[in-house]
């Protein structure tokens, strides 16, 4: 049993809305503390997560990785989830391959983690699941919150709770205007076009510049990358400006294949004798960097996952951020006699430990002329980090040599 197993105020119901990593892991961890949890899940009751075609997650087939911080959290607090993840195909690798202490990560496709989390959530006694349902409104009722829920096939209900955790993703919420203050929005002017491949047995391909990734910068602000996945799969990714004249042609599988095969040092990975394509072109626009905050006067609603903040997915931090937030929620809300004090603690911890990663993502993306003004405004981040180990950790992160899981989360205070 972990420290989360302590029970405090077990009769305080918490409603968690969402069907992604942040929602499922938060429900599991809060249940460990003895809280009564109601999960409003948009997926149907039959959804196991193992059929990617039934998922509403746009990037369900894209390569993902769980970085060291998220992996340490799973190992300690949700080992059964990690075990299931590895069983369905997640692959553990050491990013440094012997150069210094091991830095482990799990390569996976998103559906693998969803399947592992769903299987464990379905078995959690303290989690009541309202499947095939969506959160349609939240209203305040003194120190309580009322979550209004509607099923996809009709019918509705209202749940009164000590706290509502909104982990419903990035979509717009007309009901949340009175709760939400959008702190920052930094769009990313880049598109990503990816094709999933399977390596042929015995294929001889050139080594990548890093253990699981290789990247080549091309003219016209375009990049080509190979990203290794589980079970001898990889993705060939082209990132380009949304203003690049050839962008629309990358959605054509034949054009994407011919374009990538001409990339120096990486094209050989996609030759017919090396690999077989396993998907059409998977295209998506970067979500950019969004930081969304719940107004201070709201004491019964919090956000988690992409509903709270997003960073450019090219930096590969989203899954670990979601897992970290769920642990912060469980520690703050599960171990507080006064749940509203716990909410304040959670908000403080998120801003202290995760805000620096958001700022760093903005700085990494801050290369356009429009970004000059951002650099001046965010100069304080560099100044605060100047004498702090955070600067070194972020330098390592920039080079994809991910933080050792024994380090504490970064902070600028």
What kind of feature is each model-predicted range?
Residues 65-66, 100-119, 173:
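Short beta-strand to alpha-helix junction loop
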Residues 330-413:
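C-terminal helical "tail/cap" subdomain of flavin- and related membrane-associated enzymes
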Residues 31-59:
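Glycine-rich FAD pyrophosphate-binding loop
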């Amino acid at each position: 049993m972990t420290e989360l197993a302590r029970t405090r105020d077990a009769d305080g119901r918490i409603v968690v809305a969402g069907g992604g990593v942040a929602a499922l892991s938060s429900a599991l961890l809060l249940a460990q503390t003895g809280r009564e949890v109601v999960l409003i899940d948009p997926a149907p009751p039959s959804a196991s997560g193992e059929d990617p075609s039934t998922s509403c997650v746009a990037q369900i087939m894209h390569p993902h990785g769980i970085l060291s911080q998220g992996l340490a959290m799973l190992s300690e607090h949700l080992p059964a989830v990690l075990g299931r993840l590895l069983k369905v195909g997640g692959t553990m690798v050491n990013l440094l391959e012997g150069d210094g202490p091991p830095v482990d990560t799990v390569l996976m496709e998103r559906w693998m983690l969803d399947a592992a989390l769903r299987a464990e959530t379905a078995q959690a006694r303290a989690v009541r699941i309202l499947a095939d349902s969506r959160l349609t409104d939240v209203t305040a009722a003194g120190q309580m919150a009322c979550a209004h829920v509607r099923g996809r096939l009709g019918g509705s209900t209202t749940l009164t709770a000590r706290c509502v955790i909104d982990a419903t993703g990035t979509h717009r919420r007309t009901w949340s205007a009175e709760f939400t203050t959008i702190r920052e929005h930094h769009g990313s002017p880049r598109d990503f076009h990816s094709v999933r491949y399977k390596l042929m047995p015995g294929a001889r391909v050139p080594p990548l510049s890093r253990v699981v990734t290789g990247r080549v910068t091309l003219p016209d602000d375009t990049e080509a990358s190979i990203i290794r996945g589980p079970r001898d799969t990889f993705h060939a990714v082209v990132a380009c400006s949304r203003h690049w004249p050839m962008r629309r042609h990358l959605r054509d599988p034949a054009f994407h294949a011919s374009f990538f095969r001409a990339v120096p040092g990486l094209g050989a990975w996609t030759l017919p004798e090396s690999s077989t394509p396993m998907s059409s072109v998977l295209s998506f626009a970067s979500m950019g960097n969004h930081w969304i905050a719940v107004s201070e006067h709201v004491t019964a609603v919090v956000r988690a996952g992409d509903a709270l903040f997003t960073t450019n997915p090219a930096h590969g931090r989203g899954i670990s951020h979601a897992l970290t937030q769920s642990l912060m929620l469980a520690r703050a809300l599960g171990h507080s006699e006064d749940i509203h004090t716990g909410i304040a603690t959670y908000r403080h911890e998120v801003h202290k430990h995760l805000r620096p990663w958001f700022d760093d993502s903005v700085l990494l993306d801050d290369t356009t002329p429009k970004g000059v003004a951002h650099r001046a405004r965010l100069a304080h981040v560099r100044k605060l980090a100047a004498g702090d180990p955070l600067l070194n950790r972020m330098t390592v992160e920039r080079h994809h040599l991910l933080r050792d899981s024994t380090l504490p989360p970064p902070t600028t205070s």
